Amino acid sequence: YGTLVIDPKGGRPKADEMVMVQGGYNTTFDGQGNELYFVNGVPFAYMDRPIRVKKDQLVRIYLTNILEYDPINSFHLHGNFFEYYPTGTRLEPSEFTDTISQVQGQRGILEMRFPFTGRYMFHAHKTEFAELGWMGFFEVVQ
């Protein structure tokens, strides 16, 4: 899985950029739904190995939802807000929030700065998804 990023002609402000692909696995192949959920292919990966970012640095996330069986996915950030650019086709954000929802195949750009060091949890805002792997941490350092 991956994401194709096309920047606008003038570019975007310099940032620590990353791609997050949201999805799930149906491990029984029964067509009844997912048993595991993830960001970037591995359930719970960022719980044990948080994503390190620098305090006050602009962080840009290209977020893509490829989840099957479940029509809606979400991204929620604890302790901080972000600017959200749906589909990434505009240069001005549509929201300043801590939670967004995406339907299947939807994508968007999140931009944030962390004013304090420490760990900030992120996860799907559906408890089942979070409990089955779709959660992690940002580790904010000096």
Regions found by a protein language model. Give the residues of each.
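Copper-binding active sites and cupredoxin-like electron-transfer domains
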Residues: 1-142
